[in-house]
Amino acid sequence: MRRKIIAANWKMYKTCAETESFIKEFKELSKGYEEKEIVICPPFTSLYVANKLLEDTPIKLGAQNMFWEKEGAYTGEISPIMLKDLNCSYVIIGHSERRQYFSETNDMINKKLKSAFEYELIPIFCVGEKWEEREKGKTEEVITEQVKKGLQGLEKEKVEKIVIAYEPVWAIGTGHSAKGEDANEVAKLIRRIISEIYDEEVSQKVRIQYGGSVNPQNIKEFLAQSEIDGALVGGASLKPQSFWDIVRS
């Protein structure tokens, strides 16, 4: 049985003070709750504060990105050992905004996935198609390429721990979410691809999230789907009550 996982991606929102305020309130709301796994991914600048506040809770800390090298002359980048030092358990890799604004390629994402596993971070690996690709019937082609190139060279013992977030690019931050059944079909496709690369057992262990304008009103539609194991939540995770309503749905 795959445990459900709800992750908050705060993107470029919240100062340290705002992070502290959110976590204190959210800790009160979620006290004693352990049914689903909860992950909070604040900006890099708030990771230290978040780590200190989450130490006495089952809530996991995640980062929104990382570089693939351990250290070096990479101005502005954050390494996996820096994330481990801050007690991060998860790291988001390949988010569509990174692909779009920072020209991240499947090859770069593959390097990041390998590095995350090397330093015992669990990747939340994002895949998803653009609207024009969906309109042209290319969803399967795009997802297949992203999954295959992203996972290239990774052993199955590592892949079975991964979380894959299906985030249709056209649904992110737009207020337009995919329908539950459509998201479930893509989740099935992802499992089929993993089964072809590795085996059925691995494909059944991988947890798949839906992301893209998830909110308290539509979360149940996604969690009711057989192949969807949680959500990667953007804007609706910025307020403690809203995020808590999603978690406990």
Curated annotation (Swiss-Prot):
Keywords: Cytoplasm, Gluconeogenesis, Glycolysis, Isomerase. It comes from the Bacteria. One of its GO terms (biological process) is glyceraldehyde-3-phosphate biosynthetic process. Substrate binds at residues 9-11, 173, 213, 234-235. It catalyses: D-glyceraldehyde 3-phosphate = dihydroxyacetone phosphate. Pathway: Carbohydrate biosynthesis; gluconeogenesis; Carbohydrate degradation; glycolysis; D-glyceraldehyde 3-phosphate from glycerone phosphate: step 1/1. The keyword Isomerase applies. Pfam families: TIM. GO terms for cellular component: cytosol. Homodimer. NCBIfam families: tim. PANTHER family: TRIOSEPHOSPHATE ISOMERASE. Belongs to the triosephosphate isomerase family. Involved in the gluconeogenesis. Catalyzes stereospecifically the conversion of dihydroxyacetone phosphate (DHAP) to D-glyceraldehyde-3-phosphate (G3P). This is Triosephosphate isomerase. It comes from Dictyoglomus turgidum (strain DSM 6724 / Z-1310). The gene is tpiA.
